[in-house]
């Protein structure tokens, strides 16, 4: 049984987050005598055992007033989500079903601790920071669309009319990019020449992508697109990235269509907290909204 670990004092909070590493950490901020906190406690405990790949912590806002203040806790129960000590989301209230859906959402496509060896110390897999609703892919096939390349399974993204793809990836907060993983098949359909653009004010078309100067151009080898391949980026050029546009010009074997099995970015958020994502709740202390 994994269980929920109480955080006894303010100095204990950051070490607990550090210990979670790249795993999802779900932190419940609670208060003694808070009715909604008591109601959701059994479900929260059950989730901690149901999802052992995540770390579950509990913080009493009276025992850890500094931690509560730093994280702008204004009502209980409030649940904050962290990865690599970076706050990535929050959930408020005692709806166990809604909380579990949020947990499952963040565990979907979890990079997992088994990939830590591939990621340099101080960086993280940025998949949790990709805003899927803000992503776009031109020339994707109907049968093998863009969402497939964000999952580590047997599905894949495939181009439609020819070998080219134009992919825009949006992040839910500014990030710094260090490298990326770009996986493809070994049958000649894997991507080869790729132009990378960042922070475009509007979507570009294929003609614009052809003639525009990229932030960085890549010539991928067959080794680069293997499962353990990592493609370095010019880190100084990717310091404050809100979106990335990838123009896949060609594939390894001059095949009719291009396939991408999976891709993700390695880097760090620019800031530890994206306050625009979190609405401060005005209410009395201990009041749930």
From Swiss-Prot:
Its main location: cytoplasm. PROSITE patterns: PITH (PS51532), THIOREDOXIN_1 (PS00194). GO terms for molecular function: disulfide oxidoreductase activity. Disulfide bonds join 34-37. Residues 115-285 form the PITH domain. Component of the 19S regulatory cap of the 26S proteasome. Interacts with PSMD14/RPN11. Interacts with, and reduces EEF1A1. PANTHER family: THIOREDOXIN-LIKE PROTEIN 1. This is Thioredoxin-like protein 1. The gene is Txnl1.
